[in-house]
Amino acid sequence: MRIGQGYDIHRLVEGRPLILGGIRIPYEKGLLGHSDADVLTHAIMDALLGAAALRDIGYYFPPEDERWKGADSILLLQQVVQLVGQEGWRIANVDSVVVAEQPKLKPHIPAIQARLAEAMQLSPKQVGVKATTNEKLGPVGQGEAMAAFAVVLLLER
């Protein structure tokens, strides 16, 4: 049994779509990054890689590599799940939280949960997705960024 944790943060900017857990969320700003900047999916990927002792997402998908420019993070997550499986692990569950002041994410959580579960070949009951605010503190609280945390439990195959 292995436990992994992941974290990611990206700036919010105008002119980019907001993608969380592979779902496009209607909002006037999106996250800035080399790929689609999906903070939630990135945090989950890092948690999976960490639990399997496989380094981090920057090692496998470096931002200076043009192959990953604008990449769909759900496709990257599927590659990470495959890597973890090749190391002899299977995912027992994932728990995650997105930290953002706006937009309100509650209406989108079921779709995000379903998309992430599908990408990891899990039941939605194995994928926890929550949202909270940062109580207007720091860059996330001021609406300048979004962050996400994730924890995963891996079991031997």
Curated annotation (Swiss-Prot):
Its cofactor is a divalent metal cation. Gene3D superfamilies: 2-C-methyl-D-erythritol 2,4-cyclodiphosphate synthase. Pfam families: YgbB (PF02542). The record marks 34, 133 as: Transition state stabilizer. Its EC number is 4.6.1.12. The keyword Lyase applies. Pathway: Isoprenoid biosynthesis; isopentenyl diphosphate biosynthesis via DXP pathway; isopentenyl diphosphate from 1-deoxy-D-xylulose 5-phosphate: step 4/6. It catalyses: 4-CDP-2-C-methyl-D-erythritol 2-phosphate = 2-C-methyl-D-erythritol 2,4-cyclic diphosphate + CMP. CDD domains: MECDP_synthase (cd00554). It comes from the Bacteria. 4-CDP-2-C-methyl-D-erythritol 2-phosphate binds at residues 8-10, 34-35, 56-58, 132-135. A divalent metal cation binds at residues 8, 10, 42. Belongs to the IspF family. Homotrimer. Involved in the biosynthesis of isopentenyl diphosphate (IPP) and dimethylallyl diphosphate (DMAPP), two major building blocks of isoprenoid compounds. Catalyzes the conversion of 4-diphosphocytidyl-2-C-methyl-D-erythritol 2-phosphate (CDP-ME2P) to 2-C-methyl-D-erythritol 2,4-cyclodiphosphate (ME-CPP) with a corresponding release of cytidine 5-monophosphate (CMP). This is 2-C-methyl-D-erythritol 2,4-cyclodiphosphate synthase. It comes from Synechococcus sp. (strain JA-2-3B'a(2-13)) (Cyanobacteria bacterium Yellowstone B-Prime).
